[in-house]
UniProtKB/Swiss-Prot annotation:
It is an enzyme of class 7 (translocase). The keyword Nucleotide-binding applies. It is a peripheral membrane protein. Belongs to the ATPase alpha/beta chains family. Its main location: membrane. PROSITE patterns: ATPASE_ALPHA_BETA (PS00152). InterPro entries: ATP_synth_asu-like_sf (IPR023366), ATP_synth_asu_C (IPR000793), ATP_synth_asu_C_sf (IPR038376), ATP_synth_F1_a_nt-bd_dom (IPR033732), ATP_synth_F1_asu (IPR005294), ATPase_a/bsu_AS (IPR020003), ATPase_F1/V1/A1_a/bsu_N (IPR004100), ATPase_F1/V1/A1_a/bsu_N_sf (IPR036121). Keywords: ATP synthesis, ATP-binding, Cell inner membrane, Cell membrane, CF(1), Hydrogen ion transport, Ion transport, Membrane, Nucleotide-binding, Translocase, Transport. This is ATP synthase subunit alpha. ATP binds at G169, D170, R171, Q172, T173, G174, K175, T176. Signal peptide: none annotated. F-type ATPases have 2 components, CF(1) - the catalytic core - and CF(0) - the membrane proton channel. CF(1) has five subunits: alpha(3), beta(3), gamma(1), delta(1), epsilon(1). CF(0) has three main subunits: a(1), b(2) and c(9-12). The alpha and beta chains form an alternating ring which encloses part of the gamma chain. CF(1) is attached to CF(0) by a central stalk formed by the gamma and epsilon chains, while a peripheral stalk is formed by the delta and b chains.
Length: 513
């Protein structure tokens, strides 16, 4: 069969008319330099701050520097395979991480990917890593307690749900131990926990996970890991990822607790990124926005009101408030709290628990310095019985420290001063507590009651620990109903006072320690 030119032309026109091409507009750029986890991109015009950029090899970058003719981005993951001239694509999306109950009991990296070998995670969707904190109208004042299980903290520096309480001190003073015990104490409280490890050794993190598992607290906890071996970009993003995972519970009318361990290493990672991006350095070579780095993170810890929760859940949850309580950790150098990052975080938070090397080395653990430790909003959240009984504890310790300083230079002390010194020493001894042994409200109340009512006066100083252990064992075995009642109601009235007095009197009459 022969085709003439007219038929061929018609056939071609028909094919052209039928040809359907899908046009795709892509925002594409070219890598012009790669160094230390930082890439510079030319030609990526339509890009926003914090946008995810698709890189060759199924990895992503995050746009941080938007300049006139280039974009500076950090690589989330390995960057050794990237080279100049490679094409990159803007995604138009902000970084998101998986959230939901499926993350509880799991160890994940900054991007929410499981690293514990327990298989994939069933999440309830994704949420942005960077979120604007709830406004003033959406918040509610702090009025419910978070029990850490430590007598010294719950009595003198109480923490409320939705509070930001800084744990600050030199290295090896028990900061992480305090935070881990606070998590262990939440296993039956209904408070979900998030532990964010930033720039720590992998062996240290593995030990923390093992301890949480041993004490039955891992099932209630999400562990987010950005270890020392990971890039500065992942260490920088880790706290925001953990915060997003904690906000999932807050926004649904539940309570959550998040530990940032620690924000000193977080600031160092951000300083490294900023200097590599050639941002101008300021004090201690930190960039100018290092305050905003931590304030935008810690402001997300809050107690939100019922209207906020109802609006967020579209009416599914009514009459419930939600909270996210933050315990950021800061490591100081030689006790210098006036350095740049410590002063920043002190001014952002609602109080600080200051741990000192001197107290730690003297065997007073937790090494809390009651003189400069403070909780600015937690007093309103303290349980009634602990609030009534702890009033004299801080005063006794403050007077003891003052008198002890003078007593060094004076040998002839009057009886009143000697009695006060003796009482202060015993209260100091009583505030000591072993790691991984958090105490219930009733146990704390009983011990504080004994100190407040003078039951320790005839107990020798070196026997205080034995007296406490024997008293608690007796109370738990013989007066379990009273202990359960205090744990449930935390009331302080004449009936409770009489029953506690009778308990201690009968114990002292029938027991030795």
């Amino acid at each position: 069969m022969q085709l003439n030119s007219t038929e061929i032309a018609e056939l071609i026109k028909k094919r052209i008319a039928q040809f359907n091409v899908v046009t795709e507009a892509r925002n594409e750029g070219t890598i012009v330099s790669v160094s230390d986890g930082i890439i510079r991109i030319h030609g990526l015009a339509d890009v926003m701050q914090g946008e995810m950029i698709e890189l060759p090899g199924n990895s992503y970058g995050l746009a941080l520097n938007l300049e006139r003719d280039s974009v500076g981005a950090i690589v989330m993951g390995p960057y050794t395979d990237l080279a100049e001239g490679q094409k990159v694509t803007g995604t138009g999306r902000i970084l998101e991480v998986p959230v939901g109950r499926g993350l509880l009991g799991r160890v994940v990296n900054t991007l929410g990917q499981p690293i514990d070998g327990k298989g994939p995670i069933e999440n309830d969707g994704f949420a942005p890593v960077e979120v604007i904190a709830p406004g003033v109208i959406e918040r509610q004042s702090v009025s419910q307690p978070v029990q850490t299980g430590y007598k010294a903290v719950d009595a003198m520096i109480p923490i409320g749900r939705g509070q930001r309480e800084l744990i600050i001190g030199d290295r090896q003073t028990g900061k992480t131990a305090l935070a881990i015990d606070a998590i262990i104490n939440q296993k039956d409280s209904g408070i979900k926990c998030v532990y964010v490890a930033i720039g720590q050794k992998a062996s240290t993190i593995a030990n923390v996970v093992r301890k949480l598992e041993e004490h039955g607290a891992l099932a209630n906890t999400i562990v987010v890991v950005a270890s020392a071996s990971e890039s500065a970009s992942l260490q920088y993003l880790a706290p925001y990822s953990g915060c997003t995972m904690g906000e999932y519970f807050r926004d649904r009318g539940e309570d959550a607790l998040i530990i940032y361990d620690d924000l000193s290493k977080h600031a160092v990672a951000y300083r490294q990124i900023s200097l590599l991006l050639r941002r101008p350095p300021g004090r201690e070579a930190y960039p100018g926005d290092v305050f905003y780095l931590h304030s935008r993170l810690l402001e997300r810890a809050s107690r939100v009101n019922t209207d906020y929760v109802e609006a967020f859940t579209k009416g599914a949850v009514k009459g419930q408030t939600g909270s996210l309580t933050a315990l950021p950790i800061i490591e100081t150098q030689a006790g210098d709290v006036s350095a740049f990052v410590p002063t920043n975080v002190i001014s952002i938070t609602d109080g600080q628990i200051f741990l000192t090397t001197q107290l730690f080395n003297a065997g007073i653990r937790p090494a809390v310095d009651p003189g400069i430790s403070v909780s600015r909003v937690g007093g309103a959240a303290q349980t009634k019985i602990i609030k009534k009984l702890s009033g004299g504890i801080r005063t006794a310790l403050a007077q003891y420290r003052e008198l002890a300083a003078f007593a060094q230079f004076s040998s002839d002390l009057d009886d009143a001063t000697r009695k006060q010194l003796n009482h202060g020493q015993k209260v100091t001894e009583l505030m000591k507590q072993k790691q991984y042994a958090p105490m219930s409200v009733a146990q704390q109340a009983l011990v504080l009651f004994a100190a407040e009512r003078g039951y320790l006066e005839d107990v020798e100083l070196n026997k205080i620990g034995d007296f406490e252990a024997a008293l608690l064992s007796y109370a738990n075995n013989e007066h379990a109903d009273l202990m359960a009642e205090i744990n449930a109601k935390a009331d302080y009235n004449d009936d409770i006072v009489a029953r506690l007095s009778a308990l201690i009197d009968s114990f002292k009459a029938t027991h030795t320690w």
